[in-house]
Amino acid sequence: GEKSQEIIKATLKKLQDFGPDYWCGYSYSWFGNMKARAFDGEGAADALRTFAECFCLPNTFHANGDQTKSGKSKFTYRPFTLEGNFAFAAGIQEMLLQSHTGVIRVFPAVPVAWQDVSFDKLRAMGAFLVSAEKVAGQVRQVRILPEQGGTLRLAIPEGCKVASVTGNKGDKLEKEGVLILETEKDKTVTVQYN
C-alpha cells in the first residue's frame, strides 16, 4: 500500500544518502533491482548503468571494484564474480516486467527516455510468458502465452485504455485498473491498447 511505498522510498533514499564508498559492483546491480521494485525507472537505470560502466571489464566480466576509479567505490580491485552480472540481468527484467504481487505489470519501471521498447517471452509468475511493446511512450500491445492456463491479472498501464482482447476464455473484467481474464493452456491472449 501507500504507507509501504513511503517506507521503501525512505529506505532507498537512506541507502543512497549513506553513500556507496564501500559498495562493490554487485551492490549497484542489487540497488538497481530495489529501485525497479519501487517503480523508480530512472534510479534503476542509473544504478545499472553505473554497474556496467564502472564495474565491468570491456569483455563484460564483473570485476567487483570500480575499474574507472571514478569514486563510485573505494574498492578498485579486480576479483571476478558472477552474481553482479546475474543481478544486472534480473534488474533489467524487473524494469520491464513484474508479477510478484500476483498482478502482471509491463514496463513498471522504465525511464522516460525509453520511449520505444519491447520484450519477448519474459516469464511471469503463474506460468505466463509475456511479450509487450511500447511505442512513442505508450504501451500498444501485450501478448501472453499461458503455459498452464488459469486466471490472468494484468495491470492496465497508466494512460492506456483497453482497445481489444483476443484469445481469452469467457468474459473480461476490469477492476481497479486490473484486467482479469481466464486463459487456456497454450492459447495466446493479446491485449491491444489505445
Residue ranges and their predicted role:
Residues 144-159:
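Surface-exposed beta-strand/loop patches in extracellular or lumenal glycoproteins
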Residues 65, 162-182:
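Solvent-exposed beta-strand/loop surfaces of large extracellular or lumenal domains
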Residues 119-120, 142, 178-181:
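Beta-strand-rich interaction surfaces with strong enrichment in secreted/lumenal proteins
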Residues 130-132, 139-146:
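Short, well-ordered beta-strand segments enriched in hydrophobic/aromatic residues
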Residues 79-131, 135:
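Catalytic cores of secreted or luminal carbohydrate-active enzymes
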Residues 116, 126, 138, 148, ...:
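Residues that act as N-cap/strand-start positions at coil-to-secondary-structure junctions
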Residues 1-99, 103, 140:
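Active-site core of glycosidic bond-cleaving carbohydrate-active enzymes
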Residues 154, 175-194:
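C-terminal beta-strand-rich structural cap/linker in extracellular carbohydrate-active enzymes
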